[in-house]
């Protein structure tokens, strides 16, 4: 998996799920009450909202690692 793959998934709003060290992580999407869309990423049922692909790549973590650093291993 590459950053381009994740970018493509986000553009299509395609959900993605993977297991890392026995924990399930998700990438999906949500809207707030005003209609603003968010990317949701994190452990299953504990996802955090990110405003954009850039925000996700700069801040999303899997345990003590940035998500972007683990992509090639997925």
Give the residues covered by each predicted segment:
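Negatively charged, low-complexity tracts enriched in Asp/Glu with abundant Ser/Thr
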Residues: 1-19
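Short strand-coil-strand connectors
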Residues: 21-23, 46
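Short, surface-exposed, low-complexity cationic segments
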Residues: 29-49
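Mixed-charge, Lys/Arg-enriched low-complexity segments
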Residues: 49-74
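Generic beta-strand structural signal
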Residues: 19-20, 29
């Amino acid at each position: 998996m590459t950053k381009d793959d994740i970018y493509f998934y986000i553009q299509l709003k395609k959900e993605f799920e993977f297991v890392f060290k026995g924990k399930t992580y998700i990438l999906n999407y949500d809207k707030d009450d005003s209609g603003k869309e968010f990317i949701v990423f994190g452990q299953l049922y504990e996802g955090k909202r990110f405003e954009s692909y850039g925000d996700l790549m700069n801040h999303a973590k899997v345990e003590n690692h940035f998500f972007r650093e683990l992509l090639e291993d997925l």
